[in-house]
Amino acid sequence: MPEEIKRAARSATASRTTHETDITITVTLDGSGTSSVNSGVLFLDHMLTNFCKHSGFDLELECRGDLDVDDHHSVEDIALVLGSTIAEALGNKRGIGRYGWAIIPMDEALAQCALDLGGRSYCVFNAKFNRPVIQGFSTEMVEHFFISLAGTLKANIHLSILEGENTHHKIEALFKAFAYAMKAAVAITGTEIPSTKGQI
């Protein structure tokens, strides 16, 4: 890692408070994969803990949401705040790899993620799930989580399930593929902003 970039701590904290949720997130990109996640949605906690372990990000997340309604607002708003926090930690993106991709197996499931941190928000999601809910987490919210995150991260994210039957395995493989793709994309590989525009 170039010394002048290495010295700058790539960390950020962001909050969001509405009538539906109260969220605070701190992200450190060059971390050790440690996490303290309390989303109020147990399965989402499990997925975000896995994301940190495999991306190397450190994450502190606290969310109080209207789970008496359902999990939609909490999951959506966590994704929005997480995306904006990572974007802030990236700063001007000087020296980053920008692109990342991974294909990750989990037993019978096989997930693929390719992404670009180039400042353009877009999400393509190809996955179907057999179970509607896992531990309070609506599986339809997996796609919405990544769409919301792509919006505030200003990232182009493509996620697909290539094989699989078990819903837990498929979702976990998607989060792990996203983790490894992000690990590559945020890695410092040079000293320049990786765009012919001169900014991203």
From Swiss-Prot:
Its EC number is 4.2.1.19. CDD domains: IGPD. PROSITE patterns: IGP_DEHYDRATASE_1 (PS00954), IGP_DEHYDRATASE_2 (PS00955). It is an enzyme of class 4 (lyase). It comes from the Bacteria. InterPro entries: IGPD_sf, ImidazoleglycerolP_deHydtase, ImidazoleglycerP_deHydtase_CS, Ribosomal_Su5_D2-typ_SF. The keyword Cytoplasm applies. Its main location: cytoplasm. GO terms for molecular function: imidazoleglycerol-phosphate dehydratase activity. It catalyses: D-erythro-1-(imidazol-4-yl)glycerol 3-phosphate = 3-(imidazol-4-yl)-2-oxopropyl phosphate + H2O. HAMAP family: HisB (MF_00076). This is Imidazoleglycerol-phosphate dehydratase. It comes from Pelodictyon phaeoclathratiforme (strain DSM 5477 / BU-1). The lineage of its organism: Bacteria, Pseudomonadati, Chlorobiota, Chlorobiia, Chlorobiales.
